Amino acid sequence: MALNSGSPPGIGPCYENHGYQSEHICPPRPPVAPNGYNLYPAQYYPSPVPQYAPRITTQASTSVIHTHPKSSGALCTSKSKKSLCLALALGTVLTGAAVAAVLLWRFWDSNCSTSEMECGSSGTCISSSLWCDGVAHCPNGEDENRCVRLYGQSFILQVYSSQRKAWYPVCQDDWSESYGRAACKDMGYKNNFYSSQGIPDQSGATSFMKLNVSSGNVDLYKKLYHSDSCSSRMVVSLRCIECGVRSVKRQSRIVGGLNASPGDWPWQVSLHVQGVHVCGGSIITPEWIVTAAHCVEEPLSSPRYWTAFAGILRQSLMFYGSRHQVEKVISHPNYDSKTKNNDIALMKLQTPLAFNDLVKPVCLPNPGMMLDLDQECWISGWGATYEKGKTSDVLNAAMVPLIEPSKCNSKYIYNNLITPAMICAGFLQGSVDSCQGDSGGPLVTLKNGIWWLIGDTSWGSGCAKALRPGVYGNVTVFTDWIYQQMRANS
């Protein structure tokens, strides 16, 4: 985490993060524009998107910008890692053909019409009326396992209606916690049920999904039917995991590069390869870590190389704490290392983390949340405190404001290199930034008393340079993909 002297400049008016935008104001199938976050149709979550990599030069129409991932330097150029990379490279030779085969189908375009929906990576198109109708039509059944979601800052449970082709809140009438457990399981949570309760409907909804308690032993969403009334006028608020809370109650704001105290950022993990800190990550469940895709590029794509450490502030003390081996590494299937689009990956741990005051999960963002243009966010990590510096021994954290996509894409900053799957954050004066070693770590914000993961540290041009803010993977566009992986690999 790099620091330069100077006060932050003013940022400007409010804007809407379209990754969170309410569905009713979204067009049915928007074009991808360079200066904004994706808008998603009401009837489904966004289909998967691409990823990122080490130290590349991206050509721009004006000056050339050297973009550097925030991992611990170039893995195979550091003298301390040269022998490691040579050994790992030997293991990748036999898999080269398989990787090449994967590359052949990575980049595909949707051919579905506006009245159809796409079945994940298979590219099959089905009518939107068949989505969540109780019969699997997609090759992998995606149309029947993406039928429930949590909405907004209050975690309102919503279910998709295939007849109405829209999402509706679930009425509290006849609801019980057993249904809450079923809904959490449908989303991909494993034995993490936290709580459900009825809360007053403040959205002005005129339609609901209600339980048919006599429908027998079938999937939860098959028990629900569309209704224009809800006698209790209460809707279900569902928490599948206690996330986004800290044990410490700090009153002072972190403005730049302060050493973290125990429990400040309990979702932060350090990801090691053979005893070396390489990247950061964020805890979202006892078994799952969110990190950056460029962290796990070859030769580090195999889970056997990775160890996660949680709840420890100093790198020098990591090996005195508990370590967790990684069981699976799942990089986004459309990861593009050249354009740096959609830099996200997941790690599943062999054994679950034990949550305590020092180890807690952060919340994944829900659809329907809004962010201000200069929304205060926080970054944390063990990255270098200056460009080309060494990894920090102690965990550092700093506040950075969001930057409007159109401003970040101006020719004086990143000149249209920022896609809807990226978020810019920092001070244009260059006072605070993430740096090498921070890659994959969290960009979080506090709303409604809850900490939300809205970005993973991705890339930038240098560290804390003027007009070169940090760039982060836009987690708001990846939540559906994350839930898909949790379901498929539970």
UniProtKB/Swiss-Prot annotation:
Spans within the Extracellular topological domain: 105-490
A Pfam family annotated for this UniProt entry: Ldl_recept_a
Residue numbers on the Cytoplasmic membrane side: 1-83
GO CC entries: extracellular region; nucleoplasm; plasma membrane
Alphabetical UniProt keywords: Autocatalytic cleavage, Calcium, Cell membrane, Disulfide bond, Glycoprotein, Hydrolase, Membrane, Metal-binding, Protease, Secreted, Serine protease, Signal-anchor, Transmembrane, Transmembrane helix, Zymogen
Segments traversing the membrane: 84-104
Keyword Transmembrane helix in record: yes
SMART domains in the record: LDLa (SM00192), SR (SM00202), Tryp_SPc (SM00020)
Intrachain S-S bonds: C112-C125, C119-C138, C132-C147, C171-C230, C184-C240, C243-C363, C279-C295, C408-C424, C435-C463
Binding residues for Ca(2+): D133, V135, D143, E144
Disruption phenotype: Knockout mice show normal growth and reach normal adulthood without having abnormalities in organ histology and alteration in protein levels of prostatic secretions. Abrogation of viral spread and protection of mice from severe pathology and death are observed after infection with influenza A virus strains H1N1 and H7N9.
Recorded superkingdom: Eukaryota
Occurrences of domain Peptidase S1 (ranges): 254-487
Gene Ontology biological-process annotations: positive regulation of viral entry into host cell; protein autoprocessing; proteolysis
Database matches in PANTHER family: ACROSIN-RELATED (PTHR24252), TRANSMEMBRANE SERINE PROTEASE 2 (PTHR24252:SF30)
Family the entry assigns: Belongs to the peptidase S1 family.
Oligomer status and interactors: The catalytically active form interacts with ACE2.
Protein name per the record: Transmembrane protease serine 2
Organism: Mus musculus
